[in-house]
Amino acid sequence: MNAQLFQIQEGVTCLLLSATATATAAEATDAAAAGAAASPNNTHTIFLIDKSGSMSADDKLLSVQQTLESLLGMMKERDEFSLISFETEARVELARVAMTPDNRDIVRTRINSLKADGSTNMVAALSYVNDVVYPADTTHLKQGVLLLTDGHSNIGTTEDLLRRLQGLRTTYPSLSFATVGYGINHNAALLGSMATEGAGSYNVVRGLEDVATVFGDVFGGLKTVAYEQVRLSVPPHVRQRSAYAIHALPDGRSDIFVGDLQAGASSVCVVLEGLTAADRLDVRGTDVATGLPITLTPVLATEVPEDILVQGRLAFTKSRVVTFMNDVNAFLMGPGGIPDQTALTGRAVALRAEVTALHATPLRDLLLRELQRCETYLATGALSPPRLTHQRSNELSQHAATIGLGRGILSSRHGEDPDDDDDEDPNVSVFSNPYQRSASEGLRNTTATTPYYTQQAAQPLTPFPYLNVTQHPVTPPRPLQAPPTAPALTRSRSNPF
């Protein structure tokens, strides 16, 4: 892991983190990507899948089932799969199942057995993660949780959910946590907060293609983590402009949770205010390849290459754009047009000029598109019917979280918005590495060419050249049936307190 600490202007310091110590950003990305392709991590992916009654609409649950089944073809025998379903109650469907050929059939049967019914009890689902996750330092598997829901948790409170998530993060500090909202009716603020606290990503999906893209991105991310759950310890007077979770420590310092560093991904730049040359900043994480902890104490650089300064300036401006996006969201949803529309419009013009002046990069272009989107929303204001305004609000929440955290897939509108003239491909993330993009593309190809619950001849999976995985045939789906008898997996929990 490489950590470079430098100042971009008076009072503003940047910490640039990357998975390799290679000199330039381009060389680091190429070298790390090659290493990830040659030796991807063995993983344990824990899926928390909402199967409440509303998941039956628009084939939501079927899309998830099809994507999960296609994902099996991407997993190797040393990858493990856990599945927790939840509605009014939660249930461990599968726990720590290695992806051997025989086990794949068992997993397919259990996936196909899921039926939509009941309410949405996320707290119960989180309570069962303890039952399937491996304790820290007992395995070389990279572990991650993916929670998918289409609604609001109507059993338990937001505080219950975040408290339970924080407990999981304390007990299992290496665990990554991604959230996925299906459609526009989910609780964007909650899923965004959970992704921030879990040092993961917040994604929104609206159909089969989106589900495949996001699942591929999350799984590909787990396969290529080089350093897990990286965090920085800063003095109490230091404030971050970035969007990561921050918690006070007993000694008065604070921990900023950056999360995982993927091989082959862009560098992560944390923007800090108030840090001086005399202050101590510690960077901690775990080397996934060795399982050994790593600690760095970077010193403020006196001479900084221009390409490094460019990344720092971009990160600083990005933080300002994310703050602006959240303020526009507050304007759309707040009473009486607060904050002020005229002031926001003026800020948009100034920010657009600031971003345009930056060195041209895919991230800079993305920031310009988001500013244009915000200006459109400011000009049109509230829409009729109100669900369109709610949709825009959720979109801004998710885009701000994705850009602020620097991971995940931007949600797409699929032509639902009357002002949607954005021709950007929503399935291409500027934050994903080649492995993640290949995984997403592979899942999109297999789910698109093999309709779920359609009897047809078995077809080979579309090859994933970058992944170099063993190819397994896609078998015709089986009729829904009761899961195989497995007493240890039939527990349910409706009231976890």
Functional labels for PLM-detected ranges:
Residues 6-8, 18, 235, 284-286, ...:
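A structural detector for beta-sheet-dominated domains
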Residues 244-264:
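Extracellular adhesion/glycan-binding regions together with long Ser/Thr-
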Residues 237-245, 290-292:
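Short aromatic-acidic-glycine turn motif
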Residues 261-278:
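Low-complexity, intrinsically disordered segments enriched in Ser/Thr together with acidic residues
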